[in-house]
Curated annotation (Swiss-Prot):
The gene is HISN1A. Its cofactor is Mg(2+). NCBIfam families: hisG, HisG_C-term. Expressed in leaves and at lower levels in roots (at protein level). It catalyses: 1-(5-phospho-beta-D-ribosyl)-ATP + diphosphate = 5-phospho-alpha-D-ribose 1-diphosphate + ATP. Coiled coil: none annotated. It is an enzyme of class 2 (transferase). It comes from Arabidopsis thaliana (Mouse-ear cress). Belongs to the ATP phosphoribosyltransferase family. Long subfamily. PROSITE patterns: ATP_P_PHORIBOSYLTR. GO terms for molecular function: ATP phosphoribosyltransferase activity; magnesium ion binding. This is ATP phosphoribosyltransferase 1, chloroplastic. Residues 1-49 form a transit peptide. Keywords: Acetylation, Amino-acid biosynthesis, Chloroplast, Histidine biosynthesis, Plastid, Transferase, Transit peptide.
């Protein structure tokens, strides 16, 4: 493996090699670093300082320059963008399947698919960042992406509207990580990192990241000035050990990869909490025929399924003189109130040729974590023949996020 570096940086391959009085000769923003390895994947870095990277981040505290307005192209189909590969792609398709929306691909190599349950909708498989870009350009109307990708490439553009912010997959956070050795051994917070005497205008903190919008924005908001950013694709955890960077800003899920590479997160260093979200083009919802109705159906299915996730229906028979008397017994137990209260129905049986009611059926909805306690309480109240089944959907009278969406659209 050989490392190609500009000559003005070859003198100082690691932070420990910098004399305190020696200024860094920063390369121009276009200077690129490449680690050439036998495998296909490589680490590519482009250095730039805060003032350079922040060309899209206003230095006077105002909003970044707006992206060009989306153009709603005339077409009959609503376009939904899904991630084209990886865990996010599989989880997005699985979630839609759980909502009885089946993505049908004629050929797995094709980038377009159909959802038979939504005949006016096409699915387009794209890279997550391209989903955001194409929502802005008007080539897509809806998309499922991580909030990190939306924030990095959407850059607070008002045409992007979050329809559902918590799809319960793709959980991670964007965080600063530093080495757990050397000069960083006793550094445990963002404040301590910023106050290290090693950083100055001549020798700034070198931060490797793929988030060249969120990174400088976060540092500016926290008043950290002496930072130089290096943009990178992949294998960021190796950058500090290679001497390319002092710290990294990257997505963290379990944190295992950081630990295996002798890196640690710091207090106050989390830039963003992220998970998958359903996003739409505001202009498409306002102007494209059928887009709003399609979003309404997708949103209702999502909300009903996600609300039911981890919930169970519990049914038991209970002897009693009346529904009122049984209800009082059931409601005396703290875990048996259900969503809005227990459903109590008479159980009819025949004795000596006559129909009578000696038992009442109790139906409640309980979360998974309270399931066994609820069963014990039902038994204690006189319940028997307890049946348990998982819930698939809970359709409310109204979908809260739908009302919020209409308000955001001014409808």
């Amino acid at each position: 493996m050989s490392l190609l570096l500009p000559t003005n940086l070859q003198q100082y391959p690691s932070s420990s090699s910098f004399p305190s009085s020696t200024p860094i000769l920063s390369p121009p923003p276009s200077t690129a670093f490449s680690v050439i390895v036998p495998r296909r994947r490589c680490l590519r870095l482009v250095t730039s300082c805060v003032s350079t990277v922040q060309s899209s981040v206003a230095t006077n505290g105002s909003s970044p320059a707006p992206a060009p307005a989306a153009v709603v192209v005339e077409r009959d189909q609503i376009r939904l963008g899904l991630p084209s590969k990886g865990r996010m792609a599989a989880d997005a398709i699985d979630l839609l399947k759980d909502c009885q929306l089946f993505v049908k691909q004629v050929n797995p190599r094709q980038y377009v698919a159909q959802i038979p349950q939504l005949p006016n909708t096409e699915v387009w498989f794209q890279r997550p960042k391209d989903i955001v870009r194409k929502l802005l350009s008007g080539d897509l109307d809806l998309g499922i992406v991580g909030l990190d990708t939306l924030s990095e490439y959407g850059q607070e553009n008002e045409d992007l509207i979050i329809v559902h912010e918590a799809l319960n997959f793709g959980d991670c956070h964007l965080s600063i990580a530093i080495p757990n050795y050397g000069i960083f051994e006793n550094i445990n917070s963002l404040k301590e990192l910023a106050q290290m005497p090693q950083w100055s205008e001549e020798r700034p903190l070198r931060l490797a990241t793929g988030f060249t919008y969120l990174g400088p924005k976060f540092m500016k908001e926290n008043g950290i000035k002496h930072v130089v950013f290096s943009t990178a694709d992949g294998a960021l955890e190796a950058a500090p050990a290679m001497g390319i960077a002092d710290a990294i800003l990257d997505l963290v899920s379990s944190g295992i990869t950081l630990k295996e590479n002798n890196l640690k997160e710091i207090e106050g260093g989390v830039v963003l909490e992220s998970q998958a979200a359903l996003v739409a083009s505001r202009r498409a919802l306002n102007e494209r025929k059928g887009a709003l109705n399609t979003v309404h159906e997708i949103l209702e299915r999502l909300e009903a399924h996600l609300k039911a996730d981890g919930q169970f229906t519990v049914v038991a028979n209970m002897r009693g003189n009346s529904a009122q008397e049984v209800a009082e017994r059931v409601l005396s137990q703290p875990s048996l109130s259900g969503l809005q209260g227990p459903t109590i129905s008479p159980v009819y049986c025949t004795q000596n040729g006559k129909v009578s009611v000696d038992y009442y059926a109790i139906v409640i909805c309980v979360p998974k974590k309270a399931l066994y306690d609820s069963v014990k309480q039902l038994r204690a109240a006189g319940g028997s023949g307890v049946l348990v089944s998982p819930l698939t959907y809970i359709f409310d009278e109204d979908t809260p996020r739908w009302g919020q969406l209409l308000r955001n659209l001014g409808i």
